[in-house]
From Swiss-Prot:
One of its GO terms (cellular component) is plasma membrane. One of its GO terms (molecular function) is transmembrane transporter activity. It comes from Rickettsia conorii (strain ATCC VR-613 / Malish 7). Its main location: membrane. The chain crosses the membrane at residues 11-31, 49-69, 84-104, 109-129, 154-174, 177-197, 224-244, 261-281, 294-311, 353-373, 378-398. It is found in: Cell inner membrane. It comes from the Bacteria. This is Putative transporter AmpG 2. InterPro entries: AmpG_permease/AT-1, MFS, MFS_trans_sf. The lineage of its organism: Bacteria, Pseudomonadati, Pseudomonadota, Alphaproteobacteria, Rickettsiales. Belongs to the major facilitator superfamily. It holds the Pfam family MFS_1.
Amino acid sequence: MSLNFSRFQYISNIFFILIISFPGGLIYLLIGSTLSFWLRESGFDKITIGLFSLVNFIHIFKFLWGPLLEKVSFAPLSKRGYKYCLIIALVSCIFCVYVLTNFNPNTHFIPFALCLVAVAFFSSIYDMLLQSSQMLLITNKNWGISEAACTTGFRIGILIAGSGALYLSTIISWQDVYRAMAILCIPSLLLIIIYPLKFKDKIIINDFDRFWHAFYDFVKKPKWLIIVSFMLLYRLQDNFLSVMPNMFYLDIGYTKKDLALGYKAFGMCATILGGFIGGFLCRKYEYSYLLKRVLIYHALSSLSFLFLYFYNRDITSLYIAVFFQEFTKGLTMSPFFSYQLRCCSAKYCITQIALITSIAYISTILFGSISGYAATYLGWTYFFIVAGFCFIPAYILIRYLPPYVISS
């Protein structure tokens, strides 16, 4: 009986993680790629749309309030404190998204932008709590399953906020689309409220000094500056492109319905497939070899943009181009995430993961914000040519990474 109950508790915890991961992916895209379509239809130029990437700057600093969040959520109230923080973070996200829909980005630019920053802030808190839920609810040997559940829920949220929102926008206004997306978060909120949390271990409260110990431990690593530089530059191509592919597809004549199915839905499937294959290749090849190869493959995907621009703009060509772009993007993701874990010490893994993901996010914000300028002043042809060469800095740095990072 006890064994059956434990198994039931394990399965229900996995299901809980899957469901609460859904709002994370949904909100992530609402203030990212999907937002660019709304801004485009509101008359904003590519430069301004690119600058809206700066609303996510708040994610860079999430490692600073991580220890504070642990103190507030875990120390006084234990399970209830953790649940209350989850509820407050998600309710705040839903509320801010709803408030956002009451502002027109053209006539109420500053309130609109401030609402986006608020959504980004509360979503960063929700993401941290979501990541910790796996460690609190699931035993170590089952983290692989819980990560798969978390990724699945997150990707479903991205799919709904991408393909679903884009398709809905052809029927109703963008304000109503965002209201509908906010409503879709409510089932996850209700589950958080009613679900009985059972932590597998007693919660250990980290001291604030732990962050500084974790930081010092990281900077003691051999060639840590090269490790950080590689982390900043590895996804330079994707960060430089940012949301500009959305603008490109619209400029060359594709409709939002075309993009909802071909770019968002089909592209998401291609990314997931590439991620699984990339994960398998991590077990087969040394990192130094694999990282170089996937960087080159993904760099070549820029040619698909030029193919569409100069030669063929039918639906079949869109699907082929999107598959090439998103599949190779997926290939690059698994080795990179594994690389991030290899950079962490086991005893400081949570704090250091928060730290290095914040570092990686700097590249997303910095290069994403200038993508609009680059696309405007270079034109689409040279913009995608430059994007294709963005792999070179990271490719060069691979040979200088310490062996414990890139050796199998």
